Amino acid sequence: MPRYGYTTGTCATAATRAAIIALATGRKLKSVEVKLPSKKNAIININDVEIKEDYAMASVVKDGGDDPDVTTGLVIYSKVSFTDSGIYVDGGEGIGRVTKEGLPVKPGNAAINPVPMRMIKNTAMETLSELNISSGLKIIISAPGGDKVALKTCNPKLGIIGGISILGTTGIVVPYSAASWRASIVLAMRVAIKSNYDTVILTTGSRTEEYARKLFNDRYPCIDVGDFIGFSIRRAAENGIKNIIIACMPGKASKLAMGMEDTSSRNSGVDFDFIYKMALSINIKNAEIIKNSNTVNALVDEFTDDGLFKLMAELAKINLRRISNINIDVIIFDMSGNVIS
């Protein structure tokens, strides 16, 4: 059974509750109970609590469970101090700042998404009420080292600079969740539209993104969609994107040429018999070589000049245009970044 984890939003909320209790009572709790957006409760372990004369700070170690979350292991801090009234929440060290339109958070604000922001504020108000305290609070969420971790996320592409985002719609991290990736794709498209782009490049990995950026000299925004090609095309059309350039490697291109929308190896491997029949359809010599190949990349040197990959790209375009009437082009790169289609 996979082990679930908790979002950065849940961690920040728990740290906030522990810090308020510490500031008000002097108690340093080892764990706190917080209410998740699902209305369920979760008990979160507290890493550390520090109490000073005019503030208290508590921390929670981010645990993403079995999900390969780059924020796992980060320490999320909440520093709280009393004010005259209201609940003010901002980001400190390691929390990103939004610089572009199209995200749930307005430019200039800390990258604390709406659901975790509500969690933090609601928990703060409930905790004050439990303690019979009528003053306000200033709450600063931080994550030392978040600036470096953020470079491994899509934050820089989304225009979130300087740190991680405080995220979570359910409060729980589902292991190996594809939902978070799909959500980031949609966000990136909205940012592109808000930035007045009507053309985006959908890449199937970090290498194709690097090659596409170099080829187009960063003229269009690149979005790493992984295997979610069909999903991304539909969302692009819904969000007003007019033109899509698919940048991929030969293996994934062959799957698109077959009519697949999800190119994950979990769903299907490369069909070399299909590629062989493609080669026969354009009278390629030595097509028998394809039957004994282990990878599509191994065919590049032998068949690029024979038009095999140009046909592959054309078939991929025909299939992908059936998903939406959006204008679609397909570019295939070899392992060295050369365009072979």
Curated annotation (Swiss-Prot):
One of its GO terms (molecular function) is cobalt-precorrin-5B C1-methyltransferase activity. It is an enzyme of class 2 (transferase). Pfam families: CbiD. Its EC number is 2.1.1.195. Pathway: Cofactor biosynthesis; adenosylcobalamin biosynthesis; cob(II)yrinate a,c-diamide from sirohydrochlorin (anaerobic route): step 6/10. It comes from the Archaea. The keyword S-adenosyl-L-methionine applies. HAMAP family: CbiD. This is Cobalt-precorrin-5B C(1)-methyltransferase. The lineage of its organism: Archaea, Methanobacteriati, Thermoplasmatota, Thermoplasmata, Thermoplasmatales. The gene is cbiD.
